[in-house]
Amino acid sequence: AKRAFNTAKRYITFGVKDGVHSSVNERETRQNIAMLLDESLDEFLARKDLDGSISALTSLPAVECGWRSLEHFFSIINECTSYIVLRNADQVFKAKSDLHTDIDLLVSNINEFIAFSGAVKVKSNSHHAAYLINIAGYPVKFDLRTPEDGYYDASWAQEMLDSRVLKDGLYVPSPENAKWSLLYHALAHKKSVSADYAILF
């Protein structure tokens, strides 16, 4: 406890008045730049206008005022927290034209995802996975699952997150995990394999 207090005291003593603590590692740097500047770390570092001058931020983060599009939403969330689109990733960016379409995600940390996304739970039931996120002025439905909620085996769910791949701006399961998780979903969650899924096996 004394060591933690001394560390905190050092931050306070050497802190900048009216400043903001930025980060302690690359992950936190990515999160802060994405939230505050609305861009990825790579985009920020590629800037040609970084001359050391300081300017005030005058706009609210997107999580406060709403995301411009699903593409915008995922470009920022990709920098902030770990997730995968469980199914139908090729249809995600078409979901904006169909407000009845849920986007199914497995997230590593539900509280972190909610904080960065602005997701609002549809029902107060703690077991309900449905959330709404304001995208381009419309509520888009997301089903948010975690390794701990029993939707998939916890160790398998974590492995799916650990082995995720970036495809067309979205994190998705590896090809092998995509196949088996879809079959598991069809048999364990839906009790039957739909015609759409059957052609994949």
Regions found by a protein language model. Name each.
Residues 1-60:
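Non-catalytic terminal and connector segments of soluble metabolic enzymes
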Residues 68, 87-90, 103, 117-136:
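Catalytic domains that recognize anionic headgroups
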Residues 121-160:
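Conserved catalytic core of two-metal-ion nucleotidyltransferases
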Residues 2, 111-118:
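Short, conserved charged micro-motifs
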Residues 140, 150-181, 185, 195:
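Core nucleotide-handling region used for phosphoryl-transfer chemistry
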Residues 186-201:
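Hydrophobic alpha-helical interaction segments
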Residues 68-113:
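Active-site nucleotide-donor binding segment shared across nucleotidyl transfer reactions
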Residues 41-85:
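Helical scaffold of the NTase/Pol beta-like nucleotidyltransferase catalytic core
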